[in-house]
Amino acid sequence: MTTVSLTIDGRQTTVDENSTILQACGGPGTGDHGIPTLCYGETITPRNACRLCVVEVEGSRVLVPACSRVVEPDMIVLTRSERVDHARRMVLEFLGSSVDLSLTEHVADWMSVYEADPNRYGDEPATVTEPVRIDNDLYVRDYAKCILCYQCVDACGAQWQNSFVIDIAGRGFGARVSTEHDVPLPDSACVYCGNCIQVCPTGALMPVAEFDMRAAGTWHESEQTVVETICGYCGVGCGLTLHVQDNSIVKVTSPPDNPITHGNLCIKGRFGFQHAQNR
């Protein structure tokens, strides 16, 4: 394995030559020295969509996305600087003033670290308002929470499922994730694998069961436990993470580092857990 030496925040480190700056920094993180990311997925090729992970590289005129920029010999990287903090603050404020980030993990911490104030652009998010789309029994689409990170598009497309059901439609402020000709999900080629839900960072895509429990005020994530198991529907042996609340399975995910699934599941593995409930 060929390695590369570079300097990150004044400290020299050696990593594999194919590593990205984000990987060289230990991956996404929170706190004062963590690199924030919204559009990064461990098993999806980076799109550089959110621009939240930008860092400063000596000799580069512009800030570079840490999630996709590959390390180079003797590269000097600053993960925190006046330019970096300003850029991240602006991204957080732009997103926070136009998108509902209430369910986005870590965003409150990042807002505090970078002193971002989305309210200075107005108290109410100036987003494209539309009702939550509930056109099937398995998952809902709330585009008021969508940041156009492309992860669902890539998970549905060539990188994971190869169904190619959704893509980005429209332009500018009207850009949105859409099925072909914006047909209802049941009329599309969707196979309801739910892999788009797995990668969504903001809660724009959510299982119906979770959506209903949140609406009823009965979704208590802090009270949930997780159980690792193997899917019993077929012989592939997909790894499942069962989210359990009040002795009932309320959600199923799959770990991205699983050597078989890499986070992917089919409709049976992700949504077919009702048979296991004690009813």
Residue ranges and their predicted role:
Residues 4, 10-73, 86-87:
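N-terminal cofactor/phosphate-binding cores enriched in small/glycine residues
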Residues 9-11, 141-142:
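Extended, non-catalytic structural segments that build the interaction scaffolds
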Residues 34-36, 205-214, 243, 249-251:
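Acidic/polar loop patches that form or flank catalytic/metal-binding clefts of enzymes
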Residues 51-54, 60-192, 197-198, 203-230:
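Fe-S ferredoxin-like electron-transfer domains
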Residues 122, 243-279:
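Cofactor-/ligand-binding subdomain signature composed of acidic, glycine-rich
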Residues 223-255:
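Catalytic and ligand-binding motifs that coordinate phosphates/metal ions
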